[in-house]
């Protein structure tokens, strides 16, 4: 298995002939509005372009997983950092089959995407000769997660590959801990940018939560969702310092945009 990190939460899993695109934010730098104006410096998103190897990888994509997309079915509130207009256009143009939560299936189909599978939490479903399980995610602490319309993570078991748990946009919850302890993924992916809007509590794990997630992870951890969005204050350097302080750095990969990891 290879993990090709593109930008923020967008990456590609390569497994044999299959190239699985995760959460396609594919637009050029500055094509989305700022996600924070007062708490953090206002800047249009994404704050960086896709890496130079992105188009070659995207040309190979065969499937797509979307952890979350819609908020109450209202298009202007779509989570553009996980599915933007360029991502939609790509999926539609190339007829890429999408797997997402059942509650998001009709929304994506309404806008022209082909949803192959709608998943229910904790129910294992056949996927590419293996299995996929949706794990509930809580997109923030306090009341804000209800406004954010929670998505999910994905636990993937593909033939002759290490298992992988993509935790998605979530804080540390009993469901996340259950996934780590019961499913025992060989690889885990955690969003560590600590996104926060101008109102409400953080939308992703705090540093302490991320460190605990990493401790609980049975195998290697990949950290993402950093250095591409103006409401994510934690960068790679800051994360490395935290990991070093907790003696966890060797357990974690922090890929640069365009970098590939082999497992």
Predicted stretch roles:
Residues 94-161, 241-263:
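Metallo-beta-lactamase
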Residues 22, 114-123, 186-191:
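Short hydrophobic/aromatic-enriched beta-strand-loop microsegments
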Residues 18-89, 142, 172-182:
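Pre-active-site segment of Zn-dependent metallo-hydrolases
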Residues 41, 46, 99, 171-257:
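Cap/insert and terminal regions of metallo-dependent hydrolase folds
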Residues 5-18, 126-186:
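Catalytic core of the metallo-beta-lactamase
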Residues 21-23, 60-77, 99-102, 164-170, ...:
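Active-site neighborhood of phospho(di)ester-bond hydrolases with catalytic His/Asp-centered motifs
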Residues 1-3:
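Extreme N-terminal starter segment of soluble prokaryotic enzymes
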